[in-house]
């Protein structure tokens, strides 16, 4: 028998999906594979390779290679330096970030807050700076299944009042698999380029696979 709590969570996520699906300009998919490796001195290394499709799932958008070095300060508190190399049809874009995150658990719920300052590099263009703040709520349904919900804000850095440039709302589920691997299935609604007259509203459906070395 399915527990009422699980049913309520399912209805809530379905409601959010329906609410954010109206007035959508495009639909994308993000699929990725990655690995994690613990290193000495409380360090860890992560790598992810991702493919993104746009134009109602019909056109190549970009492929992303990202490597990240993280340091565990104390339990729950981490500092990270991610580097991203993204290849588009007509350009190459690089990004370097400095981030910090803190996770607090009170079973079966955990809260995670992440802040990140990122700088994007693109040939013959001015460097772009953004500040990102993200809150993630995770619920432990079982030892292997964890639904989650998150919200994220993107602010332009060093502009008038650090203007809001984009926001994202996401929900999904992380599932632990055998042999130190896991998958994550997720949906993202993102409203980007908010400084423009007509911001872009985009649906994203994603799947990621991660394994630990």
Regions found by a protein language model. Give the residues of each.
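Start-of-domain marker
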Residues: 23-85
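Repeated loop/turn-to-beta-strand initiation elements of outer-membrane beta-barrel proteins
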Residues: 41-47, 75-81, 107-111, 143-147, ...
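Predominantly the C-terminal beta-signal and adjacent terminal strand-loop region
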Residues: 149, 160-213
